[in-house]
Swiss-Prot record:
It comes from the Bacteria. Belongs to the bacterial ribosomal protein bL20 family. Keywords: Ribonucleoprotein, Ribosomal protein, RNA-binding, rRNA-binding. The keyword DNA repair does not apply. The keyword rRNA-binding applies. Gene3D superfamilies: 6.10.160.10, Ribosomal protein L20 (1.10.1900.20). This is Large ribosomal subunit protein bL20. It holds the Pfam family Ribosomal_L20. One of its GO terms (molecular function) is structural constituent of ribosome. GO terms for biological process: ribosomal large subunit assembly; translation. Binds directly to 23S ribosomal RNA and is necessary for the in vitro assembly process of the 50S ribosomal subunit. It is not involved in the protein synthesizing functions of that subunit. The lineage of its organism: Bacteria, Pseudomonadati, Pseudomonadota, Gammaproteobacteria, Lysobacterales. SUPFAM superfamilies: Ribosomal protein L20. One of its GO terms (cellular component) is ribonucleoprotein complex.
Amino acid sequence: MARVKRGVQARRRHKKILSLAKGYYNARRKVFRVAKQAVIKAQQYAYIGRKQKKRNFRSLWIVRINAAARMNGLSYSRFMNGILKCGITLDRKMLADIAVHDPAGFTALAEKAKTMLAA
């Protein structure tokens, strides 16, 4: 049986890892063993970051809605409750966008929420 050396596959695998490690400093870029660990850790951080991004944006939207609601005399929770009772099905992302770019429109939504809460 012939001996298998795997030279081509190993070089290809090393090149792939080292190309993923571009932009890293010192041995993390040049030494395969260190670069492989750095790339694996970077991919873990990227995976975690994609989950955290969703949480961070949701909290940002809530902060923006809360600030705009308080300018109209409502707390965030009472505003959201009033919006829900009105049957307005805007998500937090859209409400935050309206709060930032169209304050008059948000005021109209807040007034509707107030009327539903008063009733």
